[in-house]
Curated annotation (Swiss-Prot):
Keyword rRNA processing recorded: no
MF (Gene Ontology): RNA binding
UniProt entry keywords in alphabetical sequence: Chloroplast, mRNA processing, Plastid, RNA-binding, tRNA processing
This protein's record includes keyword Iron: no
Entry's family note: Belongs to the intron maturase 2 family. MatK subfamily.
Gene that this sequence comes from: matK
Xref: HAMAP family: MatK (MF_01390)
Biological process annotations from GO: mRNA processing; RNA splicing; tRNA processing
Native source species: Paeonia suffruticosa
Localisation: Plastid, Chloroplast
Name the record gives this protein: Maturase K
């Protein structure tokens, strides 16, 4: 009931375009704490619960409700180490709570509730990460060239705030955002390290602005010939001065229309990179490349070098992104044909989109988290004295399950079996270290039960694909499985 009441208050505040009062609500910080736990696969931060205790949250809200509540970040108080620690904690809590608030305009829950009143546009880009790969499986086999694009960062933090003004109309919230950006953070690099979640949200909202422009151009190309470029450029998505972009469009407007009318152009974005694939020639891809660079510089004041956009032919290039190595390879196929008394062989080549997991970077991520060494030999993790055996096993099984879910689309399962072996033996070494016994004797006592814990999830998933009656298909299934409920990449998979 309390959670429903909280959503009603959020809905009420958003209907009045006034989100700032939500920063004083305790459930905002509870939501931030819950989402922080869900996003962390390793859960190594043992003081996370203490950091978000109810007493600390109430103390923070009380201080913010004072007349000069931002004096808690005063530089004079930072001379005392105790106050400096508290100020850093308060700053982190406010920034994480602020992310919950500014994400409201992008939430599907509120988009659906406000769609009838036409207050905001409906966003269709809130999709699973795994939805990229089925799309590539269906489309990339028919394409010839691909561009790997490193999306540039804005040169100034104020550009990010300006991009957010259309989505968040509450001036007080924008002033609070500027306070975080310019008072507590001196540069984009320091801001991304101190407030990673807020930085990712602002970066994604900034990138979405020029992506929405591309979507508009793609959908409206059939109507642009009867619309003057000046009137077109006055649309609400553009915020800054438009004289530079008008010059770009005025040079060769018909050529730009021809460029956007490519029906075989596909665009995919992931993290700080994007992929632009087309069936056309390399000349068309080069025109896209320089148009993107000019568009970033003239409209969004973002400087980008031509080297950040590389063009490759799909037949001899592999896509390394999101923990997978994807490539288009030719499978030779010999077909014997019989015509009357004559028989002959026909050689065919079939294109296949192959997706595999990179084992070496994944082992490097496990080694960084101290589950194994750089050679892949399992290591024991230090266990807390008050942790039970079931808690330790559950933690390792959760990590193994998340990795198996994320990399379940691989066409070769041998790499996943190696990762499961490392985690299973690391779990056994951790338990043996806790009980001060040998690993061999501990595995003899708990080996079968521990193995069942790590393999139960795979059996449940495959049983949804094949019924238990078809035991042969159930045992021999080696195809990829894509989960359409994965909305964030886990820490171990993010080895780019």
């Amino acid at each position: 009931m309390e959670k429903s009441q909280g959503y009603l208050e959020l809905d009420k505040s958003w209907r009045h375009d006034f989100l700032y009062p939500l920063i004083f609500q305790e459930y905002i910080y509870a939501l931030a704490h819950e989402q922080g736990l869900n996003r962390s696969i390793l859960l190594e931060n043992t003081d996370h619960d203490n950091k978000y205790s109810s007493l600390i949250v109430k103390r923070l809200i009380t201080r913010m409700q004072q007349q000069n509540h931002f004096l808690i970040f005063d530089n004079d108080s930072n001379q005392n180490p105790f106050w400096k620690h508290n100020n850093n904690l308060y700053s982190q809590m406010i920034s994480e709570g602020f992310v919950i608030i500014v994400e409201i305009p992008f939430s599907p829950r509120f988009v659906d509730s406000l769609e009838e009143k036409k207050k905001i546009l409906k966003f269709n880009n809130l999709r699973s990460i795994h939805s990229i790969f089925p799309f590539l499986e269906d489309q990339i086999l028919h394409l010839n060239f691909v561009s790997n694009i490193l999306i540039p960062y804005p040169i100034h933090l104020e550009i990010v705030v300006q991009s957010l003004r259309y989505r968040v109309k509450d001036a007080s919230s924008l002033h609070l955002l500027r306070f975080f950006l310019f008072t507590l953070n001196k540069s984009i690099s320091s801001f991304s390290k101190r407030n990673p979640r807020l930085f990712l949200f602002l970066y994604n909202s900034h990138v979405y602005e020029y992506e929405s422009t591309f979507l508009f151009l793609r959908n409206k190309t059939s109507h642009l010939r009867s619309t003057s470029s000046g009137a077109f450029l006055e649309r609400i998505f553009f915020y800054g001065k438009i004289k530079h972009l008008i010059e770009v469009f005025a040079n060769d407007f018909q050529a730009i229309l021809w460029l956007f009318k490519d029906p075989f152009m596909h665009y995919v974005r992931y993290q700080g990179k994007s992929i632009l694939a087309s069936k056309r020639t390399s000349l068309r891809m080069n025109k896209w490349k320089y148009y993107l660079i000019n568009f970033w510089q003239c409209q969004f004041y973002v400087w980008s070098q031509p080297g950040r956009v590389s063009i490759n032919q799909l037949s001899n290039h592999s896509l390394d992104f999101l923990g997978y190595l994807s490539s288009v390879r030719l499978n030779p196929l010999a077909v014997r044909s019989q015509m009357l008394e004559n028989s002959f062989l026909t050689d065919n080549a079939i294109k296949k989109f192959d997706i595999i997991v990179l084992l070496i970077p994944l082992i490097g991520s496990l080694a960084k988290a101290k589950f194994c060494n750089v050679l892949g030999h399992p290591l024991s993790k230090p266990a807390r004295a008050d942790s039970s055996d079931s808690d330790i096993i559950e933690r390792f099984v959760r990590i193994c399950r998340n990795l198996s879910h994320y990399h379940s689309g691989s066409s070769k399962k041998k790499s996943l079996y190696r990762i499961k072996y490392i985690l299973r033996l690391s779990c056994a070494r951790t338990l043996a270290r806790k009980h001060k016994t040998a690993v061999r004797s501990f595995l003899k006592r708990l080996g079968s039960e521990l193995l069942e814990e790590f393999l139960t999830e795979d059996g449940q998933v495959i049983s949804l694909i094949f019924p238990r009656t078809s035991s042969t298909s159930w045992r021999l299934y080696r195809g990829g499985i894509w989960y359409l409920d994965i909305t964030c990449i886990n820490d171990l998979a993010n080895h780019e």
